[in-house]
């Protein structure tokens, strides 16, 4: 299987995991209820996020849809163009694409994004699997850029 096909399968599997977790939460946890998952570390709750990160820009679903489509198109184009470059770059973009599309599916099908993870040890926003993909993907891209910068300075 070509590298592009492998990346596409990974993106689909990641989206599937995100949607599976969201579906479980919607089916098993009443809206707003908090359940301890890993005591003193992580709780599960069911939150309908109609905004962006930290619930900003509430009820602007078409704005988010357009932005997501533009960013995803750019990320997919860049990934396609640089597929043979850095494994870090491919990994980071794969996570970003899966995370963006996972939340996009929620916005288009329900009008909100399902969030569920609450960190008990810090005051932090409730987030979901797709948000985790996006966050880790951005960190991996930053590492890829730093590695490229360091390697570029050696030449």
Model feature map: region roles:
Residues 1-155:
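Alpha-helical transmembrane bundles and membrane-interface segments of multipass inner-membrane proteins
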């Amino acid at each position: 299987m070509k590298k592009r096909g492998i990346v596409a399968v990974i993106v689909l599997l990641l989206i599937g995991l995100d949607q599976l977790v969201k579906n479980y939460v919607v089916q098993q946890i009443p809206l707003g209820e908090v359940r301890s998952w890993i005591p003193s570390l992580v709780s599960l709750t069911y939150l309908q996020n109609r905004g962006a990160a930290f619930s900003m820009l509430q009820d602007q679903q078409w704005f988010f849809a357009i932005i997501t489509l533009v960013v995803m198109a750019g990320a997919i184009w860049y990934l396609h163009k640089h597929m043979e470059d850095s494994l870090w770059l491919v990994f980071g973009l794969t996570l970003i694409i899966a995370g963006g599309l996972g939340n996009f599916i929620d916005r288009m099908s329900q009008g909100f994004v399902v969030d569920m993870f609450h960190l008990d040890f810090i005051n932090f926003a409730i987030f979901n699997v797709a948000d985790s993909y996006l966050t880790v993907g951005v960190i991996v891209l930053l590492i890829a850029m730093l590695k490229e910068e360091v390697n570029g300075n050696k030449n």
